[in-house]
Each structure stands twice: as C-alpha cells, then as structure tokens.
Amino acid sequence: MSASSTAAASTVKGTPGGLTRRRLLGASAALGGAAWLLRGTVGPDSAEAAAPVPPGLPAGTELYQRVFQNWSGEIRTDQLWTCAPRTPEEVPALADWAHANGWRLRASGYRHTWAPLTVAAGTPECARVLLVDTSRHLTAISAESPDTVRVQTGATMEALLAHLADRGLGLTACPAPGEITVGGVLAIGGHGTAVPAAGEVRPEGHGFGSVSNQVVRLTAVVLDPATGRYTLRTFDRSEADSAAFLVHLGRAFLTEVVLRAGADRPLRCVSRLDIPASQLFARPGAGAGAGAGAGAGAGAGEGGVLGGVLGGVLGGVLGGGGGPRTLADFVERDGRVEAIWFAYTEYPWLKTWSVTPNKPLASLSVDHPYNYPFSDSVPEPVARLAGEIVTGAWASAPLFGQLQYLVAKVALTGDITDVLLSGALLRQLLSGEVLTHLLAGGLRSDLWGPSRTLLQYVRPTTLRVTANGYAILVKRADLQWAVSEFAAYYRELLAAYQARGEFPVNGAVEIRVTGLDDPASSGVPGARPPLLSALRPRADRPEWDTAIWLDVLAFPGTPGLERFARELEQWLLRTFDGARAGLRVEWSKGWAYTDAAAWSDPDLIGRVVPDSLRAGGGPGWDEAIAVLDRHDPHRVFGNPFLDGLLK
C-alpha cells in the first residue's frame, strides 16, 4: 500500500475534520442521498392528487399519479399523471386523445435510465405529460415460430430470456440488468458484450450487435393519414421504415415485437483479478508490466504486489499463466469480455465468457441469473462508506475503490491475504464476520450454465450510480490500441484531479466489446440496420467491425464529476475523430457535457452527435427523423429534449 493511501486509510483528508474511523463506523448503513426509492401512486380521487385530472380520457383508462425517478435519482419529477393500458389497442386511443388535447405520451417501465429521454428532471405536475406504464399489463410473451418470440414491450428482459430458455433458445448477448423492459432496451439500442472468438462462426439466429438488430417485425402506434387518427401498424423488417423504429430514443411507441433467437449455447464465465491494468490495457507491442501507466493513484498499491503473486496462482488454475494478458488477447480467445476497473486501484475485475457445451470439472454449475450476491446486495461496509461519500466525504474515493476491489476479490476467489495486509480501517471494515458472509455462498470465479444465467447479473439492489457512455467504432486489429489510449488518458486525468485534491470518480470504469449491427442476424432478406443505433456500420469504413463501450461511474452529485466527464468526452472526440476510429454516444447514459451538467452542450447536441450518425453516407440520422416525423407528425411521442435533439 502506498504512503498516500495508507494515510487515507486512517484519516481521509479533504473533508471537515477528515473521515475518522469513528465517524465512518458510526455512519448509517443506508446509502442516504444515493438511495433510490420507489414512490407510491396516488389515484385521481385521492386528496393528495393536486393536479387536475386530464380531461376526457378514453373510458376505462387506468389512471393514477406517480413520481418519475430514474435509476440514479438524478431525474425526479413531481407527481405526474400515469396510465397503464391493458391492451395495445388502448394506446392509439390515448394518442388520439393526447393530440386533441395538447398532451404528450411518454412510455415508461422500470426507469433504469440516465438520459432525459422520457421526461426531464423537475417536470411539474401541471405539465401536459401522460406517462404510459407498459410494465403493468403489456407483458405477454409467446412463441411465434421455432426460432422467434413475440413479446410485448412492457415485458422484462428477465422474463424474455426465461421464456427463450424454456424453449432451448437464447441470445448471444444482452444488457446485464434483468428488470428492464424490452421496449426500453430497444428504444436505446441496448447491448451486451460479445464478438466472435477466434474461429467462431455466427450460429443461425444469433447476432453480435444490439438487441434491436434481432427484431424481425414490430408493431408501432402511428398516424393513419387516411383517417387522421392513430392506429397500430405492423412493420416487417424488410420494410425500409422499420429501420427508424428499431432504435427510436422514445420518439415512437412500440407495443410488441417479434425477435429472432438461436439455439442456446451454455457459457462458462471466469472472473479474475490477477492482471494489472498496465498489462490488461497495455499499448500494442508493450512487454509485460508495461502499458497504460505504472500506477492508478492513491490506493493502487493495496492489491498490487500481492495481487500479482497470488493472482498468478489463480490465473494458472483459470487458464492464465502463459495465456492471454491483454484485453485484445482475451477477446480473441473467448469473444466475450467485461473489465470493471475500480477507481484508484490497479487490478481490474475481468470477466470472460466462453461458449462451453459441457460443464468443466472446476466450474460451479448455476441454474439462475444474478450470481454475484456481493454485487447485487451491497455489503454493509460498502454501504457505510458510500453513505459517507454522498454526505460529503468525497476524498474517501480511493479508500472506496480499494474496498470494492477487496470485496470482489474475497467473494470471487476466497483470497483474504490483501485484506490482512491492508490498512487498519480497511481491516476493521472487512471484519471476520463480513468475510464469513462474503464467503458463505461459495466462490464465484468460475461459473457454468445456460446463457441467461450468466448474461444477467445486475439486480435493482446494486449501487445506484450515474454513468457516461460511449462506443468507439474501430477495426478489431486496433482494439488494444483504442483501449490503451483511453486507459492511459483516464489514468492521467484522474491523477491530475487527485493532485489538486479532487476526486470526481468514486465508482469504476466499465469496458465491454461488441460487434456491429449486421442485419443478416435478423434472418430477414432486405433488412437494414437500425438507423439510430450506435452500432450501425459505416458504409465508408467496412473495416470498422468492432465497438468498444466505455462507461465511467460515480455517485450523483460528486464534485467535479461533470467537469471531469467533459474533459474526457472532448479527448475522446479528438482521439477517435473518424481517421483511425470513430465515436458515438450511448443513448441511455451521460454525454454532451458542460462543466456543470450532462446533455447540455449545444454543439454536441446540435452538430457532433447527429454528424456521428450521418458520417459515412447512406441512410442514417436525417432519414430516421423524417420517418419518425412522418408517422407521428404531431409529436405526441416526444419531449422538449428530443425536440431539440431530433431535428
């Protein structure tokens, strides 16, 4: 442990009086201001329903008021009128009503989002906005054909994958949370992490891009120009207009889709924490131990030397030793990777998934998703320190990064040596009772099972953080170059802030790798890729076949976070400027930063982001907007933010 991090472990400077052991251990286990609460509903006849009831709604509309609060708690509204249609046919009637009365409809599910694509923070109860909750009733799932599924857009991804599994089917990749709606995933081009491993051929029904690209047919609420009324219309994937609806950002309303899937392929998921970031994210051609800097700031040393020695033993058991050491190496071998690099630490949590038909002897067999209980249910020490951070102890971020790293290492590998050699405060936080609890469920470093059990691993009970998000489009041979450039700059920027006594990141960097949206994956002749997908290929750069997804996580309200995110975003735009690689934003997360806020830079919103989906020629940004406007000319499905973006 470095001298600076040792000091941090006893008394963290930068907060009034420092963060003493007594203050920390006396803190509430709750997350305080970071906690996300599901607000109750208020019916139209309740005395608490202050806003006038929307006039003239279609008969039988299930109506109530509810606060909209998103995943991170950054978007919170007044009580807004909300309805829950029981059938898809109710939605066109609601759209007709909204048009006639000057209201707008916003589809809503489990609110697992960051960007203001549904509603803006602070939307008042008097706003003429009607939330349409699809998650109550529009949840039907049924078999359409042997390799397709018909699913209503309010169904959860967990329910969808469970249905597919019961039929022996699966997806190659999908978002990690299970409690998110299918409609929400499609709206933003949700993805997982997967590219073909060396020698792997895409099986029928599978794809390496977004979930949206697996759609073969969709039903949307559109205006019928002949009658002037809204109606349900089904678009086959072969129809040109369908490409605008596959990723629509909330500018449309889908009631159901038909998705293609393939025969399920069991996966083996191996976790390891024995490769330092300087090797995992090394520049191409760098020798072992060289790469993206030599340290990660205060706290980097805690898992350092020991992590390398003991992790090497673990790595030998799990296929390490003389095996892959860089991210690109693991991608080449397994095709499916995720790196979680806790702030101010040196050893990322690397997960790799490999297609493995039969259970390996050393693997733990699992038959349900969410197999990382230490991550799903926040351990008490992590909750304590998180509570301290969000109430002002921002300088404890290096300590928090170390704590998260140690919790993951103990729970995954059973190795407590780093805990025993850590500072007094960390040893006190990770008491014998806590360690016993972490180890009680068995080690989780090597899992095997049906794909859905290993693709979904984020519960709503995990830490609620905010995140930025970007996709770097690059040729696969340049994957390691792009990752190493990012890692070096991120480390440099974080260290510069720390040198000034600022700690803008207290979560982690997450890195995933996917393919692009090849419409052949849908199995529909004449299909086009989703026009607004960050994974839409560029016609002029056919060699760009890979996307690297980058997220930086932190608690909302962290001082300097937006300024840090802006500096990082501007660097990404300069570095991946279309010459060797390109950059697109991840719609659901943070982007277009000013020094004060996300989704606020007028140049990014008005020029840079649209141009990223215009570049390369062919149908793209402008065609998508034209199609969506043509099918909803009254902009019933929209909000002021989308009005400014999609123009």
Residue spans of the language-model regions?
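Short secondary-structure capping/junction motifs at helix and strand boundaries
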Residues: 104-106, 168-176, 227-233, 267-268, ...
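Glycine-rich N-terminal segment of FAD-binding domains in flavoprotein oxidoreductases
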Residues: 73-173
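C-terminal segment of N-terminal export signals and the immediately downstream linker at the start
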Residues: 17, 38-76
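Structural signature of FAD isoalloxazine-binding scaffolds in flavoprotein oxidoreductases
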Residues: 115-138, 192-225, 253-257
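Conserved glycine-rich FAD pyrophosphate-binding loop
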Residues: 122-124, 434-647
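N-terminal secretory signal peptides and thylakoid transit peptides that target proteins
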Residues: 11-32
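C-terminal substrate-binding/cap subdomain adjacent to the FAD-binding core in PCMH-type
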Residues: 215-507, 512-513
